[in-house]
Amino acid sequence: MSNQNTLRDVALAAAALCAAMSVIVPAVAAEKAATKPAGTYVSGDFHNHTTCSDGALSLQRLVDRSVNAYSLDWFVQADHGGSSARNCTLREDPFEPVAPALGLTNSATGPYGGTVTYPSGGQPASTGKGPNQSWQSTLPNGVADIKGDGTANPKRMWRWQEIKEFQYPVLEAESRKHNKPVWIGLETNNPGHEHTSTTILTGQLPWPKTGAGNANLMAQFEYCFDRSDTDTSRGAENQWDCSVSGSPNNSLIDPVSRKIAKAGNLGGGNSAANPDLGHIKSVEAVKWMNEKAPNTSFYVPAHLERAGVYNPTANRGFNIEHLRNFNNAAPRIAFGFESMPGHQAQEDRGGYGTGAAGGGTFGGTGAYAGLIGGVWDALLGEGRNWFFFASSDYHNRGSFGADQRETNSDFFPGEYTKDHVMVRKGKGKGDLTAEGIIDGLRSGNSYVANGDVIDRLSFVVCTANPGLPIKANQALIEKAAANAVANKGEVRIDGCATMGEKLVARPGADLIVAVAVRDPQGKNNSPYSFPNPSLKQIGVTQPLDKPELDHVDLIGGLVTGYVSPADTARYAGPIGTDAASNKSAKILKVFNKTNWTAGNDGVRTMSYRVPAVKASQYMRLRGTNLPAATPFETDAQGNPLSDWEASPVDQTVKGNIACADAACPPHMRTVAGVKYSSFDVAAWSDLWFYSNPVFVEVINGVKVAGVK
């Protein structure tokens, strides 16, 4: 909001609200407003890849694209565990930019015409150049500099050595070069399951820190707990031990490698001979993190629906009991999941085939969070601190080069998906530090948005002042939310709680839910300005690079308390079972242009009353650019449909949403001369945001035990 009078009015309204709230029905949030440090929302990404695993770019170039080209405020680089032959610390060779070089080509048939030959895999096109060169050929002493087991030629370097000796120093230098927190994590191939995004910050010194740090603990974690790391050297000169103090599972540790392993199963994963061994090892990993770095670590299962339901004799999938086990073992370490995967521009969106748990993605989100009443709602219904995150999972742009804006695989970090995280000031940590970001992720005070469908959010639940009319309560709290959005902050008023917090209220109190979002004006990062083909079906002409928020759903459910592991029927089971469901979850309210207030700078404010609250509960938000009943995209209630509805599995048949504009690019699914929404066009057409929950605990009711 640029109007000075408007800002003054909002500030006065917020001050009036503070006075009004002083006589509110007694309630508390996570902290009193006067003692809770102020903060701001900052955006970042913690799951992406370089040539040190299966990515296409060097460390330096990926960092630059993420924090410079796409302006992320923070960045965690997280390659896979295991080993790699390629040296990702080597920069790309100098080259003449390959057309279109950050632009789009022109031809007689439209701005994306097929007359240009693109280099396969991007720049560098040769596998023998830049970061595609091997460690063996680029280290001073060749193979002698590569530690641990292995006889391949060229010899592969174990990920622990890459992290400790090569990648960390580069990332520390990049962090200080860009004056932003940049540090190293790991997408671990977790035993018994598929992949998990992790970090251990202890030892690392990203900007604004100074001095020479280290990633020794991160490297040790990879050696100890990645199922693709079958090295037995104990980290060579490090002589690491992977035991957890006092754990009965230390009896499973192999005496040579000093990690949980079996003969013929050095990764310690599930197998027919060792069912569930992998999951046991993954729980030990969480416990080890909690012992070694309880305040500077996280363990966030990635694209967890992708590999299908859990199999005790294989390494795939996560059922709800595994998430509960992780959270029970260390709630400060395992506090959420990436149910919105990366790879959003792939034909099978997110890389989710029909064998994924739930059968695919729904508006780009996996079934665990994308379907109301499912796994996420079941966890929130226990009152757990289990939060929603997303990532780019950047590897490459498919058949396009890194400097081309089209993609039929991945988006760069910050190009399409952003995690917006509250980072607080003070507490001796400065304004923006890696520690503050990890604290923010752990707090649950965060939200995710694709395609900048929104770029700011304030979401708060307050007890109403019984001395004021309800409409006056709502107006005041809406003003406070709008003021918070204008300042990229949150509402900080006694008697209110925001995302990741709980409000404790007396039974019978009225609650006010207030939301303010900013639908940013102007263009997002989409390279396409032709009309959104999904909306064109219903007669709406809206450029793909100028999306507009259509509606916001307020979703809620009851909190009924933690389920005991002994209650197997309610604790364990795949998607769709009672254990993985919360039947109380539903849409409480839909906000759109008919009932929200449109303000300056794209700000939309809205509110909802919960009269005479009786039961402990939670509320969360989602929103989209697509109206309810958009064919092949949303149902009559506005829920996202399976992404296979728009783009069928069989790639040889026509899609269901035609792209008839002359500017529709040639790489789209094309059958009988007709182009159909697919790849990046489908992703830019179908945008969603998700907030994390606000909890309400009713006095003498069910405790929201997982949230302070």
Which residues does each PLM region occupy?
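Extended, charged catalytic domains and RNA/DNA-binding interfaces, predominantly
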Residues: A29-K708
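Gram-negative bacterial Sec-dependent N-terminal signal peptides
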Residues: M1-V28
